[in-house]
Amino acid sequence: MIKIRITLESKEDVIREILVNPENNLEYLHQIIIKNLKLDEFEMASFYITDSNLDLGEEIPLFDTSEKEEEVITMKNMPISSVLYSEDSKLIYIYDFMNMWRFFVEYLESSEETTEKCTHKVGEIPEEAPNLKFEVECQEDVESYEDT
């Protein structure tokens, strides 16, 4: 088992620490998050691999919604152990794309426990999603074009 911490990005503290089998897939972790935070199971969600600064990397969606012919990595075919395996391992979990609930998911430690369970709980989910500001750094200047 591994212990992970799930933290809602909000003014209020909403934290869950959970023991989970790392051989399960991210879809299973998604279901554990939904259950422990009492979220609606019918909303879309994605995990994002991050670097040490929590900059978003590769998206791992719940379902493949792309029109690409090649196989897209989804939660179902990504083991938890491939993305959460050390103290440097962190994910961002976006739930409900209309309201953009954002959670930080981080590896805490390996555990000898044999039962999956919530080991620590702080706070409850607010009724409305936190109003987050997403900032994007521009790498290049954008030229403006005028209609002729």
Task: Indicate where each model-derived feature is located.
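Short linear regulatory motifs enriched in tryptophan with gly/pro/ser
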Residues: 1-148
